[in-house]
Amino acid sequence: MAANPVFAQETFRFFRDLGKNNKKVWMDAHRDRYQAAVVQPFRRLLEEMAPVVLELDDRFDTTGRTGRNFSRINRDIRFAKDKTLYKTQMYLKFEQPQPGERASGQLYVGLSTNTVTAGFRVYSGPKRRESSLALVAEPRVQAETKWVSKQKQRLGRRYDSYWYTTEKGEWTKHEGWPVKPEDWKKIQGWIVRRKMAPGAATKSGFPKELARIFREVYPLLKFTSIP
């Protein structure tokens, strides 16, 4: 007998309803629904995926803490342009603790109102010069100038790639693969992902598909983030 799916359509309905009723009074009245539709399925997915990522590298953090493995539903509106109180998406992410809480690469999967995404991402964090992008990825790309092009050839047909720089203090998105070594002197983030319809997450084989994705993109994390 096939295993029960981790997620149901109720997860996506909850995010859509939250988007229409993004107020504390609504969220407080629907906490039980949030737990059943979002929190519990994501914790089950962590249990399913932890052995997979630990097989790739046993230094991955799989402790199940909010912030470390799970994104926060509450939005920090102090500095955000979007002043809505709650995010209409949730992420499960795996990364390896770095010295001084240095920003590092992640394997991740996210569900939102109408989309599922999964893959690899790395950001510079608040201090780029102290991030894995600056200390690990940039010098490696300068030493192996064809590495990104090889990853594009390996993954480009199945995965989307985009990256960010800052221009005049604003984040600027660049579609495609950062194949030029000079790109890595200013890159602030890089994402390589698969984008799927909600139905992908409601299938019993979803964890198996995630395992395949994580194995395929793990070399990106290893190259850009692990000293």
Region spans (language model):
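Gly/Pro-rich turn-and-neighbor structural signature
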Residues: 35-82
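Short, charged, low-complexity amphipathic alpha-helix
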Residues: 1-29, 223-227
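Hydrophobic/aromatic-rich, well-ordered segments within soluble, folded domains that form packed cores
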Residues: 19-33, 101-104, 108-112
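Aromatic- and glycine-enriched beta-alpha-beta binding-site module
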Residues: 75-140
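Compact, glycine/acidic-enriched structural inserts
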Residues: 111-175
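C-terminal edge-of-domain segments
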Residues: 193-227
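A non-catalytic, amphipathic alpha-helix used as a structural packing/dimerization or gating element
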Residues: 25-44, 48, 212, 216
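A solvent-exposed interaction/effector surface
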Residues: 153, 175-202
